């Protein structure tokens, strides 16, 4: 009975999208593996790959191959995408989330 009281239910929604969570992972660890991103965010490795590819395609992340691994660089000066936040930069968001 005590274990049930101590465990927290998985939230059904979050304030941040999976894209934001992936961006935070990459900013914290530029050499992070897709499997580690997936585990940290709580998504499949395939979903992590899709999100990273979308961030790369849109120019928010640069992917550089180093041997058998990828290294990522977040472009912090780009504006956020939503009209309510477009006057802010990606770096502003990361500063709040990583601090």
Positions of PLM-derived features:
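Amphipathic alpha-helical dimerization/coiled-coil segments
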Residues: 1-7, 79-99
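Short alpha-helical segments that sit at the start of domains
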Residues: 2-21
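Short, locally clustered residues in the helix-turn-helix/winged-helix DNA-binding domain
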Residues: 24-28
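Short capping segments at the starts of secondary-structure elements
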Residues: 29-33
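Alpha-helical residues within the helix-turn-helix
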Residues: 39, 56-57
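Key DNA-contact positions within bacterial/archaeal DNA-binding proteins
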Residues: 46
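Short, Lys/Arg-rich nucleic-acid/phosphate-binding segment
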Residues: 65-71
């Amino acid at each position: 009975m005590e274990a049930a009281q101590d465990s927290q239910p998985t939230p059904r929604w979050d304030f941040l999208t999976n894209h934001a969570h992936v961006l935070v992972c990459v900013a914290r660890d530029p050499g992070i593996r897709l499997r580690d991103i997936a585990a940290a965010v709580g998504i499949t490795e395939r979903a992590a790959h899709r999100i990273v590819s979308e961030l790369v395609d849109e120019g928010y992340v640069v992917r550089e191959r180093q041997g058998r691994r990828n290294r990522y660089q977040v472009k912090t000066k780009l504006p956020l995408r939503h009209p309510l936040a477009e006057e802010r930069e990606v770096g502003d968001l990361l500063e709040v989330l990583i601090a």
